[in-house]
Each structure stands twice: as C-alpha cells, then as structure tokens.
C-alpha cells in the first residue's frame, strides 16, 4: 500500500514496503554498508522516497484486517453535549440552555431539538454519554481524544503519540489497492495545528493523513465560499508525467540481478511503485474525490456547504477503499453567544451526519462503515455570563463529561451507553475514557488494540494502554 503527502500543492507518492537498510555480509564499504544496501539507498533516492521513514517503519504488505472503514467527523473546539446528544430539559434554567429536547426514532433516546434529522437515525447510533478525561486544555484534550493518551498541553503542543487514523493506516493500510489509507478533508487538524494530533508522530510522515486542500481549510459550516478543486488534485496530471519517468527508470533497472536481494524488497518496490503509477495515470483516486459525479438530490441530502460537501466526499472515498477519513468541522469553542453560535453550526452538522447515515444505509455500506462524531471535550453545564466584551451567555471547556457518537460499523446500535447526572456535570454510570473509544474503533476494524509499534527510542508502545473495547456495542 502507499500513502500521500502534500507539499506546495503537489503530490508526492510515498510508498512503504518491507525494506530495511542494514549491514550486508558481502562487499562492505568503509561505512559498513554493502553494495546491496547502497543500491537500495540510491534506488529510494531516485524514486523520491524518504529512506528515514522506510528505515523507521516496516510496512509488511499484509492484507487488510477486514474491509471496514472509519469516517471521523471531528468537531474542533469542543461541542456542547447538552445542546446535542445529552439534553437536560429538567435542569435549572441556568444549565439547560436555549432549547428543549425531542424524541428520536428509538423510544427513550432523546436529542436536542436542534438535531431533528439525526433524531430519525438514532437506531443506527450508539450514543456514548459518559466519556470523560477531566481536562479542559484544548491541546491536552484533543491529543487525548485522538491518540488515546495524555501527552501534549498548551505549553508543550508537540504531538507525543500517533493518532488513531495514523495507527489504522500503519496497522491496516487501505482496503483497496490504488487508494490512500488515510485522508483528511479538507485537511486534518486539531486546535489549529495541521495535521496536529491527527498526525503520525513516531510512526513517521508516511502515515500522516493525505491533506486534500490546505488552501481552503477550517471552513465554517455556513460558509458560502466556492469550494475549489484542490490544487493537489489539479497537479495529478503533471505528476503523472513525472511518475511515468520513474517507470522508465524502473524498466532500465530490470536487468539488475535480483539474486543480490534475497528479501525480495526491490521486487516489492517495483510492485508498489506500479500501483502508484496506475493510480495517478488511470485516475481512480481522482475520481473518488470528484463529488460532481453525484446527483443534485444527493448533494442536497448532505447539504451544500463545506461540511456536507466533504462528508459526501468521505463516503465516496471509503466506497473506493480508503480505510480512515477525517472530516474537519471546526468552530465549536463557544464561550459566548451560545444560541447564535450553535444556530450557525448545528443545522449543518445535523444535515451532514443524517445524510451520511441515510446514504450509507441505502448503499448497503453502513455495516462496514463506522461513523464517529466527537470533539476534544464537552462544555460547562452551567451557562456563563459571556466573555470579555461579549456579555452574552456561552459555555466554557469541560472535560468531565462529553458525548461521542458511534454509528454503523456492525455495532449493536439504537442504544445509549452511560449517563451523566441531572445537570450533565459528570458520569454516573459506565464512565468511559478516550482510550475505550479508540479501542472500540480498532476492534471494529479487526485490529488488536494491544498491537505495538516502536517509538523514537525503539520501545514498543501499544495502541492503547488501559482502554478496552466497549463490549455493550460489539
């Protein structure tokens, strides 16, 4: 399988194969490398690959654990759980907020009245109402939710552990040849960092998400900005010609005696490089990114703004074999003007998620596609008095309770897991941590959550330390 990186709006195809530069037994030079190792190093350089990544990583070319995919809808900034999936209409006025609740299509499950479309699809969802990590720092919270571990803070923002998407890319690869494993739409981010805590950390840049459009990123749901074709896709044709030149290079090397490489690494490199050429020249991935091929009715179902646009694109990508897609839906850090702020956000989220679930169901894809909706934390249950200069109530950071949605994916849906108290302040049953959520995602994909990869120091680090898959939903 192979992976994509964007640099100055051009595509660089990163191919990861089981290839190790190591000291050979014959013909060593003064640096301890054999002719075989030198050949590998030169070969990688000629193809524009990062030998540092290839040394650090070993892509084992395994078949996918299963054919399931994940679409992560990332609500950057932290949405209010009380105005979405855990309303408390009987709480005191200063807690319950501007809206009431409403029934869903599952008796006993109620959502905010601002989510009428999703309310029709509660039977396809598992509503986790008891997730918490008790941290109100954007950076610490986002790192925890996306990696399953505490690590970064506002004073030390560097990513410490790989994201769930990068780990899936590393452990599973794409579901279909000729597609990237991990894509960010329009660009994966967390707390204004790209890819931020959705990156690969010590797994290496080969497992970062393919960032589709860094030129038009962090778009609000209500944005009427015309969504342009990503420059990275516009350059595919030019890149195709450059890759075709690399094919000629490969052909010129066909006479190399493969007996010098008993591991078969060069043959594998040829094969993966050819897959890259096929993708670029035949346009399979390019087609997957093109939502203009969809009907007007379907585009209306998702919503015509950026959030609906990229959620529909995410469906197209998993349909073609991408294993993990993250859709960025930002601007949830609403410290003031909670009513106005959420009226600008919730309808677009509601339409995009509901449209996705309906579309997946109609296409027979829902059982094999896990949809995750989450941000870095919830919001303070008690309304504040606004923020400096904006004396209109909002909600502040709250890591003590939040809601996460898991939908489809073959789960036992139509249920709520866990509960918060009458004011949505903290869990009172089945308390869950971020690593429990991530362990569930890995399990759905057929990946053992205790799978380990080496960190920068060469120590094996499991995907999750203490988290366990949520047995009630499996």
What residue spans do the PLM features occupy?
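Ligand-binding pockets and gating/stacking loops
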Residues: 4, 14-474
């Amino acid at each position: 399988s192979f992976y994509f990186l964007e640099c100055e709006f051009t595509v660089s195809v990163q191919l990861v194969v089981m290839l190790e530069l190591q000291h050979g037994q014959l013909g060593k030079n003064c640096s301890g490398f054999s002719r075989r190792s030198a050949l590998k190093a030169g070969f990688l350089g000629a193809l524009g690959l990062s030998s540092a990544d290839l040394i650090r990583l070993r892509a084992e070319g395994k078949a996918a654990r299963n054919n399931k995919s994940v679409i992560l809808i990332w609500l950057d900034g932290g949405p209010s759980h009380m105005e979405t999936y855990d309303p408390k209409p009987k709480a005191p006025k200063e807690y319950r907020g501007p809206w009431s609740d409403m029934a869903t299509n599952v008796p006993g499950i109620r959502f905010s009245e601002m989510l009428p479309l999703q309310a029709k699809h509660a039977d396809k969802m598992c509503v986790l109402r008891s997730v918490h990590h008790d941290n109100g720092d954007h950076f610490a919270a986002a790192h925890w939710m996306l990696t399953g571990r505490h690590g970064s803070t506002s004073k030390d923002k560097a990513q410490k552990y790989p994201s769930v998407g990068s780990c899936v890319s590393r452990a599973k690869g794409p579901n279909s040849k000729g597609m990237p494993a991990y894509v960010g739409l329009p660009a994966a981010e967390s707390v204004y960092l790209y890819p931020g805590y959705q990156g690969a950390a010590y797994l290496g840049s080969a497992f970062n998400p393919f960032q589709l459009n860094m030129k038009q990123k962090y778009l609000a749901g209500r944005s009427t900005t015309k969504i342009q074709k990503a420059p990275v896709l516009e350059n595919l044709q030019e890149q195709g010609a450059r890759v075709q030149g690399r094919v000629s290079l490969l052909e010129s090397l066909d006479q190399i005696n493969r007996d010098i490489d008993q591991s078969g690494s060069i043959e594998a490199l040829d094969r993966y490089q050819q897959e890259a050429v096929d993708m670029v020249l035949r346009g399979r991935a390019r087609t997957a990114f093109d939502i203009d091929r969809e009907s007007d009715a379907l585009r209306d179902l998702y919503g015509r703004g950026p959030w609906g646009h990229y959620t529909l694109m995410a469906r197209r990508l998993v349909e073609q074999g991408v294993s993990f897609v993250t859709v960025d839906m930002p601007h949830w850090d609403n410290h003031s003007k909670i009513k106005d702020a959420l009226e600008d956000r919730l309808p677009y989220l509601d339409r995009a998620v509901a449209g996705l679930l309906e579309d997946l169901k109609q296409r027979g894809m829902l059982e094999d596609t896990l949809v995750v909706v989450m941000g870095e934390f919830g919001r303070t249950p008690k309304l504040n008095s606004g923020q400096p200069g904006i004396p209109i109530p909002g909600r502040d950071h709250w890591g003590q309770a939040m809601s996460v949605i898991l939908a489809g994916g073959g789960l036992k849906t139509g249920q709520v897991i866990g509960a918060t108290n009458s004011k949505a302040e903290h869990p009172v049953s089945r308390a869950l941590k971020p690593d429990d959520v991530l362990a569930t995602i890995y399990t759905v994909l057929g990946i053992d959550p205790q799978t380990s990869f080496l960190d920068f120091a060469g120590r094996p680090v499991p995907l999750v330390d203490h988290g366990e898959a949520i047995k009630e939903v499996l």
